[in-house]
C-alpha cells in the first residue's frame, strides 16, 4: 500500500503565512532572502559565535552586557526581529522565510536571542501586536 505524498501549499501560502497576519503582504521583506541569509550567517560568525563559550559556561547575567551589545548591533544592521512586520521594526518575512532564518540562527544557542526572536518572546510579541492594548504594544 502506498501513501500519497502530501500536497504542498502554493508558494504564497495561506493568508496567515506571514509572520504576523494582517500586515505587509507575504514576501514584502526589504532585501532578497539569499542576501539576508548571508548577512545573518556573517553576523553570527563575526559577533555571536565568539560569545558561545561564555553563553554555555557562564551565568546569563555575566554575559548579558556583551549580548546587549550584540543585540544593538543586530538592530543597527537591520537584522532585528525577523518575525515582525517592518511597520514594527522587524524584517517583514513570510513564515517560510523566517523558518530559513531560524534554521541559520539555530546553529548557536545565542542566535535567536541576538536577533530578538527567541522563544517564548516571539509568540508573545505577535500576540501583543495583534490583541494587546496600546499600552501593551
How should these model regions be labeled?
Residues 1-32, 37:
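Intrinsic disorder at enzyme termini
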Residues 6, 45-46:
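Catalytic cores of phosphodiester-bond-cleaving enzymes
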Residues 16, 49-137:
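Glycine-rich flavin
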Residues 33, 40, 44-45, 74:
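Short hydrophobic motif
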Residues 35-39, 80-83:
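Short low-complexity stretches enriched in small and charged residues
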Amino acid at each position: 500500500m502506498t501513501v500519497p505524498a502530501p500536497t504542498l501549499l502554493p508558494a504564497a501560502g495561506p493568508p496567515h503565512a506571514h509572520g504576523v497576519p494582517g500586515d505587509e503582504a507575504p514576501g514584502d521583506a526589504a532585501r532578497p532572502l539569499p542576501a539576508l541569509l548571508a548577512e545573518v550567517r556573517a553576523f553570527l560568525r563575526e559577533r555571536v559565535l565568539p560569545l558561545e563559550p561564555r553563553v554555555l559556561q557562564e551565568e546569563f547575567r555575566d554575559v548579558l552586557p556583551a549580548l546587549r551589545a550584540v543585540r544593538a548591533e543586530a538592530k543597527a544592521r537591520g537584522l532585528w526581529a525577523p518575525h515582525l512586520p517592518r511597520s514594527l521594526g522587524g524584517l517583514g518575512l513570510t513564515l517560510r522565510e523566517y523558518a530559513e532564518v531560524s534554521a541559520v540562527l539555530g546553529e548557536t544557542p545565542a542566535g535567536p536571542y541576538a536577533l530578538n526572536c527567541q522563544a517564548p518572546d516571539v509568540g508573545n510579541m505577535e500576540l501583543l501586536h495583534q490583541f494587546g492594548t496600546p499600552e501593551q504594544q
